[in-house]
Amino acid sequence: LCLPQADVVALCLPATNATYHLINYERLLKFKADALLLNVGRGNAIVTNDLIKAVKEGHLGGVYLDVTDPEPLGKDNQLWELRDTIITPHVTGNYNLERTINNVVNIAIENINRFCNDQKLLNVVDREIGYRENH
């Protein structure tokens, strides 16, 4: 990891054994003091208590969290009180958009047809690695 040189570290990670608590206190100490940490993947990629400690000690320039651990974040969680920290609600997939719902339904219909015809399914997630491999 190139943490000491990075101005911005953006986490867009799936929840897997390999990414669980990837960013801990030891790694946070390697960040530049003015570095920004963004997490838009899964909350458990960061050890929450370690992040709180590192920010309070001034080891980061700012934090943006679209995801947290736990999620939802309790009203008394210390993350809400951190300086230079922005927390937004994690809304995956924009299911409020009609085109998103249509996409999901169309993929499901296509996969039912493929399954019935012994064809390869679309968007299959590899349970070992925790995400869809590009084909």
Regions of interest found by a model, annotated:
Residues 1-78:
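Rossmann-like adenosine-cofactor binding region
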Residues 71-135:
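C-terminal helix-to-coil terminal segments
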